A protein has these predicted regions:
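Alpha-helix/helix-capping structural signal
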Residues: 7-8, 39, 77, 119
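Short, hinge-like loop/turn segments at secondary-structure boundaries
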Residues: 52-55, 90, 129-133
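Short, well-structured N-terminal submotif of metal-dependent ribonuclease cores
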Residues: 1-36, 49-62, 139-140
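Short, conserved active-site loops that position catalytic residues or coordinate cofactors/metal ions
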Residues: 37-43
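Active-site neighborhoods of divalent-metal-dependent phosphate/nucleic-acid chemistry enzymes
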Residues: 71-116
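Acidic, PIN/NYN-like endoribonuclease modules and their adjacent C-terminal/linker elements
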Residues: 108-140
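Acidic active-site catalytic centers that drive phospho-/nucleotidyl reactions
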Residues: 5, 43, 98, 117
């Protein structure tokens, strides 16, 4: 499964996004399923509602229901690790959505991600030392 960040979803669903064409072209070539987290889902819905129009967020939610991506469940046990990550990367700063994706990489055992946020995801490490591999690196 490919981990998907907020920027990827925004570029895919918002035709006015600067990365829409590149992300859309990349998206149609992929055969692997996507996975994301509830903090990312929340962030995407909020931004689609404010950047596009209120019902655009429902398109995103319906896409999940149609099987476009899986949703990783964050438990209470994960909150300590996410807060530790946010402290470690406070200088960027790391938000809850990003912390949830680094945690997801640790849970999946790989750091393959799609994100338009190249700076932060180039800096973050899963398992404290493993770099994330942004599959959009050569596309954007």
């Amino acid at each position: 499964m490919i981990i998907a960040d907020t920027g990827f979803w925004l570029a895919l669903f918002d035709r006015r996004d600067n990365h829409h064409q590149a992300v859309r072209a990349f998206f149609v070539t992929l055969k692997e399923p996507f996975i994301t987290t509830l903090p990312v889902l929340t962030e995407v819905c909020y931004l689609l509602q404010t950047r596009c129009y209120p019902l655009k967020a429902t398109d995103f939610l319906m896409a999940q229901q149609a099987g476009l991506f899986h949703l990783f469940t964050i438990s209470e046990d994960h909150l300590l690790k996410m807060s530790q990550l946010m402290i470690e990367y406070a200088d960027l700063p790391m938000d809850l959505a990003d912390a949830s994706l680094v945690l997801l990489a640790e849970e999946l055992g790989h750091g393959r991600i799609v994100s338009t946020d190249r700076r932060d995801f180039h800096t973050y490490r899963w398992k404290n030392s493993e770099p994330l591999s942004n599959l959009l690196e050569g596309v954007l």
